[in-house]
Curated annotation (Swiss-Prot):
Gene Ontology MF terms: eukaryotic initiation factor 4E binding; translation initiation factor activity
Record keywords: Cytoplasm, Initiation factor, Phosphoprotein, Protein biosynthesis, Protein synthesis inhibitor, Translation regulation
Family: Belongs to the CAF20 family.
Function, as annotated: Acts as an inhibitor of cap-dependent translation. Competes with eIF4G1 and EAP1 for binding to eIF4E and interferes with the formation of the eIF4F complex, inhibiting translation and stabilizing mRNA.
Residue segments, region Disordered: 45-137
Extent of Basic residues compositional bias: 48-70
Compositional bias per record (Polar residues), positions renumbered to this chain: 118-128
Organism: Candida glabrata (strain ATCC 2001 / BCRC 20586 / JCM 3761 / NBRC 0622 / NRRL Y-65 / CBS 138)
Name of the protein in question: Cap-associated protein CAF20
Amino acid sequence: MIKYSIDELIQLKPSETLKVSFDHVEFRNIIEKVVELQKLKEEEFHSHHGNRRRSSHHHMKPKIKHNKPKVKTDADGWSTLEPATAGHEEESSSSATPAAAATTKTGAPQETIRVKPNNKNISSSRPADNSDIIADKQTHGFNAFAALEDEEDE
């Protein structure tokens, strides 16, 4: 493959025709080498950064599948909803009598969750001004004792 220097390229004129001596085999070998180097760099990058979570991943909400409750119609025509849970189906099939079904516990036990409030947002580090308290006070109030005294006088 013929290589030209920058000075030679500047001296060449576009109107002149150049002899084409292009070696396809050498050009393909160069391209194959470049492709192999790119593959090696990609493999090296993925081995170091393949399991990294991207920062934009947290913007999506998780998709939760909610099961629809079953509609059960009685002989009288009343329709009731009962949630479809795996534990409820097993217990209803194991107990044949309604009395046995009433004694067995259905559903998961409730857990007590203690919530700790964020006191930083609730409390204030600055004491309240007396002028603010006076401004919030109701100016025209109803005095029940004064009304009772007025009724006794009449």
